[in-house]
């Protein structure tokens, strides 16, 4: 699978994870909404966002990321807690979604190099996060990587 297809899967997954966090909705319904809303066909996006189309998105990876984060969110939260400078409940919901996604990839998807996980999380934070979210996400993941992944 091409790296761009996984990047697109992450792009959709972060939005779906954020939606799940905000609504606490059924993850299968959220996933179906993303699959049926033509989001994989034509996504209105910022100029620097990737072009998102079904042939260019790894749908299996999207499914794995979304469901993996939802099913393991408590474990992921406990793994990130030691690296946070503030309580989990004080995190912005998008920062929390970004960190959960990255922690999932770092701990459950060892086929993805940790440097790729960190770089992709930073890029997503630049697109979806607040002004300095990418710096915060980078700091947390840089501290967590040596413990969670043997470099």
UniProtKB/Swiss-Prot annotation:
Keywords: RNA-binding, Transcription, Transcription antitermination, Transcription regulation
Pfam family, one: NusB
Signal peptide: none
Cellular component aspect of the GO annotation: cytosol
InterPro entries reported for this sequence: NusB-like_sf (IPR035926), NusB_fam (IPR011605), NusB_RsmB_TIM44 (IPR006027)
GO molecular-function terms, A-Z: RNA binding
Gene3D superfamilies, sorted: NusB-like
Record GO biological process: DNA-templated transcription termination; transcription antitermination
Alphabetical list of HAMAP family matching this protein: NusB
UniProt similarity note: Belongs to the NusB family.
Protein name as annotated: Transcription antitermination protein NusB
Protein's organism: Photobacterium profundum (strain SS9)
Lineage of the species this protein comes from: Bacteria, Pseudomonadati, Pseudomonadota, Gammaproteobacteria, Vibrionales
């Amino acid at each position: 699978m091409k790296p761009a297809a996984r990047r697109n899967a992450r792009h959709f997954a972060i939005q779906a994870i954020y939606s799940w966090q905000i609504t606490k909705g059924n993850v299968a319904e959220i996933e179906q909404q993303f699959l049926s809303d033509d989001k994989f066909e034509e996504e209105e996006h910022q100029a620097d966002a990737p072009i998102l189309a079904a042939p260019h998105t790894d749908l299996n990876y999207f499914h794995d990321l979304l469901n993996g984060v939802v099913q393991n969110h408590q474990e992921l939260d406990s793994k990130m807690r030691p690296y946070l400078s503030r309580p989990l409940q004080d995190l912005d919901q998008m920062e929390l979604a970004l960190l959960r996604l990255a922690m999932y990839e770092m701990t459950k998807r060892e086929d993805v190099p940790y440097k790729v996980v960190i770089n992709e999380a930073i890029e997503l934070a630049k697109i979806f996060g607040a002004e300095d979210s990418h710096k915060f996400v980078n700091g947390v993941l840089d501290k967590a990587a040596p413990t969670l992944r043997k470099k």
